[in-house]
Amino acid sequence: MSYLLDPSRKTITIPKLQAMRDAGEKIAMLTAYDSSFAALLDYCGVEMILVGDSLGNVMQGQQTTLPVTLEQMAYHTECAARGNQTSLLLTDLPFGTYPTPEAAFASAVTLMKAGAQMVKLEGGDWLAPIVKFLVERSIPVCAHIGLTPQSVHALGGFKVQGKTNAGAAQLKRDALALQAAGAQVVLMEAVPAALAGEITQSLTVPTIGIGAGADCSGQVLVLQDMLNVYPGRKAKFVRNFMDGQTSIEAAVRAYVAAVKDGSFPAAEHTFSA
């Protein structure tokens, strides 16, 4: 399944993302776990498609991402890759699959062969040697800092990170260390907006935020969250883009437009220290 794309739509590459960041053009990212939604996101102009281990929550009904396996991530990556034509497709390395540089490389190769163009790893400055090992072996990396869902039990729940002076200083060290190790993108989750802005200014690579304020180079949401698939309580950083729309395509286009013009995230979607 594929859409007839606008001829002006160019393939999104890592240099293109860097150029967007340097020019101040916002980057839109959403999750997709299958061919049909990947094709739709690509058609709607989403620059980055994340095959996230969030599939454990939204596809499998798990309470955390921890049960998701590498084989499951590879399967969903294959599905999404078949629908994608021009967006940059990145995939999460699931919990427990990157304890050492060698193990991380083997896991990343599995995902790259399945169609990923970049892998995402969760962790702080301790992750730098693993990132360096991957990048030196032609595996592009997005480093995920702040609230790292794979560490939910160690963190004591899904809590905002970097609210104390010590926590903020550590996140700054994490970001710089991971960039120095070769990470081409840094994703920040549930980080006070002012801190995320400072980190973005301190880096030269693009930053992607989810609950990290409007000053990041781009934004990401879980597709099912922004489509309001789930009733009830939602994370503070989620906005219902189906509100007022008559189709999923229209909702996705509204999200892309809101990211591009800076109206999302608004103040109500962000955290303070």
UniProtKB/Swiss-Prot annotation:
Identification of the protein by name: 3-methyl-2-oxobutanoate hydroxymethyltransferase
Note on cofactor: Binds 1 Mg(2+) ion per subunit.
GO cellular component, one term: cytoplasm
Family: Belongs to the PanB family.
HAMAP family: PanB
Keyword Zinc: no
Quaternary structure and partners: Homodecamer; pentamer of dimers.
Active site: 189 (proton acceptor)
Major localisation: cytoplasm
Residues annotated as binding 3-methyl-2-oxobutanoate: 53-54, 92, 120
GO BP terms: pantothenate biosynthetic process
Alphabetical UniProt keywords: Cytoplasm, Magnesium, Metal-binding, Pantothenate biosynthesis, Transferase
